[in-house]
Structures are given as C-alpha cells and as structure tokens.
Regions:
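Short acidic, glycine/Ser/Thr-rich loop/turn "cap" segments at secondary-structure junctions
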Residues: 57-60, 104
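Conserved N-terminal alpha-helix of the aminotransferase class I/II PLP-enzyme fold
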Residues: 55, 62-95
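Short regulatory "switch" loops immediately downstream of catalytic or recognition motifs
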Residues: 16-23, 140-143
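Short clusters of hydrophobic/aromatic residues that line enzyme substrate/ligand-binding pockets
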Residues: 9, 61-63, 150, 218
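PLP-dependent class I/II
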Residues: 4, 27-33, 38-53, 85-87, ...
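Conserved PLP-binding active-site segment in aminotransferase class I/II-type PLP enzymes
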Residues: 1-19, 28-31
Length: 394
C-alpha cells in the first residue's frame, strides 16, 4: 500500500457539490450515483490541504497576486513532467479554461466567422462558439474499432471552404481519450500554419496520460508551431481543485498575447481569487508524489472497468483511454434509441453519466463515465448497471 489512501470514501453531499447536490435540480432522481462531471472523488493531497488551511488561518483575504515563486513552481512542473520550459512572459492567468476559450473566440474571430472543432468533443467547445455568434464548423473524428483518428483532409478542406481562422484542439482528448502523437500534432499544425489558422490547445488533462503514451505540449513542437498557438493548462483536473477557479494560459506570440489580454480586460476580469493562487502554487509544489500514486490507482480502475464491461455487459464496447480518467462507452449494439438508453441508465441503473449526445451528434451512441473514484464506488456503479442490463435481457 502506498502513502495515500484512495480507497477512502468521502461524503460529498451537502457541500454544494455540483456533482452530488444538484441531481433533482437537473432533472435526475435524487438517488442516482454520479459518474458524470469530470472531477474526482478523492481528497486533495494532504500536503496541499495543509497549505490551504494555513492560508485560511491567516484570516485576511484581501487582493492577492501571484509572484515569482508562483511562476517558478509552474515552470518547474512543465519542465520536469513534459520537458517543456515556458517563458514567464507567455503566462496569462484566467479563472478557467472555458473562460479562456471564450476570450480567444472573441479576440481572434468576428461574429459569423467559422471556428473549427472535432466532435465528439468537450461540449463547452461548441458552447463558446454558439454563445458568441460564431459558426461552428465540425470535422468529426474518424471512429475506428479501438481508437479515433483525425480527419486531416477534412480539416484542410473545411478551413479553405469555410474560411476558418481559429481551431479549438483538445489534447488529451475528452471524451474519446486519445493522446495525439507528435506526428499527428505536427501534421495538424502544418495545415493550420499553411492557412494562417490559430490553434487553441486545451491540455487540461495532460497530467493523466497512461503507460505507453506521451503528452506533447503543442507549443513545444517547434518555434513556428508555438507562434501559431495558445496552450491552455490548469491544475484543476490534476489535483481536484476545479472549485478554486485557476488556469494558466501560455501564449508565446507577443501580438496574440496582447490581443488576448485586451479581450480579458474588456470583459472586466482582473485577478485570480486568493485561494486559487495559493492552491495552484501549492499543488504544483507538493503534489507530485500524490499524483504519481493516484495515476496508478486510476489506471487500475480503467482496467477494472474494461474487464467488467467485457465480462458482464458484452454489447457495450469500451474505448481504452490513452489519457484522461474519462471512459468512452459505445452502446450502439443495445436495442435502444439514445433517449431510451439514457432513461434506462438513469431510472433503472440509477446512474448519472454524461450522455454522448452532449459531445455532438457523433456521440449519440455513447456514454461517458468518470472512473476517478474509490474502487468500491466504481464497483457499486458497474454492478448497478449490470443488474439493469441483465433485467432487460440484453
């Protein structure tokens, strides 16, 4: 047994948890077991918890700003983990990556212009496009038997035909779990550079890349790629601190960075909250041993889920993720429409998953499940699904 106890089950109800306390308000039964939103059912590293407690005990929460140590800790993390050393001047802090995506859409496109994405993909990608009155240009990923691939020809064709100037990339990819290879990223980058398309790379899941795969920061592909990209990072998924509202955006191109900052200024945003700054710096400073153990635990959960579904629900096909703690389940062989399937899972299995249609029409046959939880919780959920599966005679 390691230093940290990931088997501990924490009662998250009555904490204003989006995951646990808002089922009824979101139209779900009160007794569903949630595996939907991408936060983890693990306590933060105890060393980080102590840092946060010490700051709270100080008792004063006035205006706060990051200092040299904040960036040095951040830089050290990326150098150690990804062999990428960002420059301090590239950093722009925001309260979240979705906010940063919206700011990029507003800063670098005009109303009515096309923004390209690859569905199925994290649903706020489409939201920030639609909400800002841009045209959503979708070039779907190519679904293979065991993994998805990028439709490079389709992307280049869409860029030319739809006059696309901005591309939102998800790497590691949520929900299909791909970790795009360096060759794939360079090919994508070459297309975008050729047609002067800015790439905004959401790399929030970069710390959860599984054995046999390597995350390549887009800005680390080479100078020309760095000049055509914005890299979005955050400690929120890595250390389960999404509620602290802090993200670190890296923009190597001076002109692009000035335009991005101007858009943030126009939105009236100025500073991160106190606990976000303390939590981010603290997490990257002390959280590495905890994360290394956690990754082993989650990888075991992933394998357990693959084996369990194959053995007991064989009409459901699991895509093994190369990264993220989210698993993409193909339910197309079930004799149910997407709506019927969702109602069956919610009302009979009593599970709250993210239905695949949230990620675009290309995800209609799928469900997404979050396996970043204690094994007992995962077993309880899968066993409930199995009982509902067997009761239907599938």
């Amino acid at each position: 047994m390691g230093q940290y106890n990931f088997d501990q089950i924490l009662d998250r109800t009555h904490t204003k948890s989006l995951k646990y306390d808002f089922a009824v308000k979101r139209g779900k039964p009160a007794d569903v077991l949630p595996f939907w939103v991408a936060d983890m059912d693990f306590e933060v590293p105890p060393e980080l918890k102590q840092i946060l407690l010490d700051r709270v005990n100080h008792g004063v929460f006035g205006y706060t700003e990051s200092d040299d140590e904040y960036f040095e800790v951040l830089q050290n993390w990326f150098t150690t983990r990804f062999n990428w050393t960002p420059d301090r001047k590239w950093l722009v802090k925001t309260p979240g990556i979705v906010f940063a995506l919206a700011m990029a859409v507003r800063a670098f496109t005009d109303e009515g212009e096309g923004v390209l994405i690859n569905q199925p993909v994290y649903y706020p990608f489409s939201m920030v496009i639609d909400d800002n009155d841009r045209r959503l240009i979708n070039v779907p990923l190519i679904k293979g038997e065991d993994k998805y691939t990028i439709d490079f020809e389709g992307i280049e064709r869409a860029i030319v035909e739809e006059n696309v100037t901005l591309f939102l990339l998800c790497n590691p990819h949520n929900p299909v779990g791909r970790v795009w290879t360096e060759d794939e990223l360079k090919r994508l980058g070459d297309i975008c550079i050729k047609h002067n398309v800015l790439i905004v790379s959401d790399e929030i899941h970069a710390d959860f890349v599984w054995k046999g795969h390597t995350h390549k920061v887009f800005a680390d592909l080479g100078e020309s790629y760095a000049e055509h990209c914005i890299v979005c990072t955050a400690p929120s998924k890595t250390f389960n601190i999404a509620g602290l509202q802090v993200s670190n955006i890296f923009i190597p191109n001076d002109s692009l960075r000035r335009r991005f900052i101007k858009e943030i200024d126009r939105a009236g945003y100025s500073q991160l909250n106190t606990m976000g700054i303390v939590g981010c710096e603290g997490a990257y400073k002390v959280g590495a041993p905890w994360l290394d153990e956690l990754k082993e635990y989650i990888q075991d959960n992933i394998q357990f889920t693959i084996d369990y579904v194959a053995n007991y629900m064989p009409k459901i096909h699991v895509y093994r993720p190369e990264g993220t703690y989210l698993m993409w389940l193909d339910c197309s062989k079930l004799p149910l429409s997407p709506k019927e399937r969702d109602e069956w899972i919610i009302n009979e299995a009593k599970l709250w998953l993210d239905t695949g249609s949230m990620f675009g029409v290309d995800g209609e046959d799928f469900e997404r499940i979050n396996v970043a939880c204690p094994r007992k919780t995962l077993e309880e959920g899968l066993e409930a699904w199995r009982r509902a599966y067997e009761a239907r005679g599938f």
